[in-house]
Amino acid sequence: VGSEMCIRDRCHTDHTPGFGSAAKYVASTMLEIAHDTYIYQIPSVVIVEIMGRDAGWLTAASCLARNDYSPAPHLIYLPEVDFDEDQFIEDIKNVLKTSRCVIVAVSEGIHDKDGNYISATSAVADKFGHAQLSGTGKALESLVKDRMDIKVRSIELNVLQRCAAHISSRTDINESFALGQAAVKYAAEGMTAVMSTIKRVSNDPYQWIIEPENVSLIANQAKTIPLEWITPEKNDVTPEMEAYLRPLIIGEVSLQYKDGLPMYLPVNHLL
């Protein structure tokens, strides 16, 4: 019996444990980057590289940072659709017509129409044969520097997206406990080769149930964002995408602190 462990892209489940908290971190960080960027009067472009080789769920979650006063990220690029460098530059120029700065969210796995990754470094395969990507943000930073006379920087969120326990989603924590408990229950009942999964009932109010699913249908399969949740211009997500994501980041977790820092479980056995 399995209990999920993945950032997001497992098939046959609405989402996986940890995704809501990672999405909350991405959106919060994007809002904080926006605040820092707005301080300066110099026109600028900020490119934020977010995890996502084949699926752009975490990058899409950056849309949750938008509020009444901040439209950032102004542009969102996902690996589910082809990326065009010329159109990227035009998109930036269009935003600059009405905004002093442009904040871009980009998945590490974006690629051109021929399937080539937009990455400043060669892709190295991990033990599963999946490309380990890095440098996408830097590649786009160089592109903007070459094509435009404007201040530009790139930011790679990297492992922070999956280890920022200080900003966990209460919804995510509750679901994670429930999934683990269900997995133990399935094992006690003699079930095998199954995994506990989340099935969404509704968005508003957000309701869900847990059901077992055959692991053979899930293993090594990636669940990508529906194309209808990506705008025709391929540079943003739709309101349906936001409505899907929003419930997953709701709620906060109270942490205990010691000497000014969060107290986490000791990991002596890993050292």
Show the residue positions of the predicted features.
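Glycine-rich, charge-decorated loop segments at or immediately adjacent to ligand/cofactor-binding or catalytic sites
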Residues: 8-15
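C-terminal non-catalytic interaction/assembly regions of soluble proteins
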Residues: 117-271
